[in-house]
Amino acid sequence: MSDSEYLTRAEAVLAAIERSLDDADADIEFERSGNVLTLEFENGTKIIVNLQPPMQEIWIAAKSGGYHFRFVDGEWRDTRNGTEFYAALSEYATQQAGEPVEIAP
């Protein structure tokens, strides 16, 4: 994948997260600064989603740990266990929000 293809796909992920959070019932604040999207929950915990262009990855830093995702066969997948990006982010957000959170493309 070229660098421009990576950026187009990765930027679309950040935009999709923002749209999902705008529509979510959960009270999750978010702020974007360049390639970094910070989600802040009512309890003060945060999830950081950031783009890593040199590696063509998207990284998530959550209370449960750090996760790296790479675009494989049309989806962003965890480089360790193959979990799909939106499913993983929804799970981490649900854990930190203490209520169901669904983040979808």
Swiss-Prot record:
Gene behind the chain: cyaY
Role noted for this protein: Involved in iron-sulfur (Fe-S) cluster assembly. May act as a regulator of Fe-S biogenesis.
One matching Pfam family: Frataxin_Cyay
Record-level Gene Ontology MF annotations: ferric iron binding; ferrous iron binding
SMART domains: Frataxin_Cyay
Keyword vocabulary terms for this entry: Iron, Metal-binding
Superkingdom: Bacteria
GO BP terms, alphabetized: iron-sulfur cluster assembly
Family membership noted in the UniProt record: Belongs to the frataxin family.
The organism of origin for this protein: Paraburkholderia phymatum (strain DSM 17167 / CIP 108236 / LMG 21445 / STM815) (Burkholderia phymatum)
Metal-binding found in the keyword field: yes
Protein name, UniProt field: Iron-sulfur cluster assembly protein CyaY
InterPro entries xrefs: CyaY, Frataxin/CyaY, Frataxin/CyaY_sf, Frataxin_CS
A single GO cellular-component term on record: cytosol
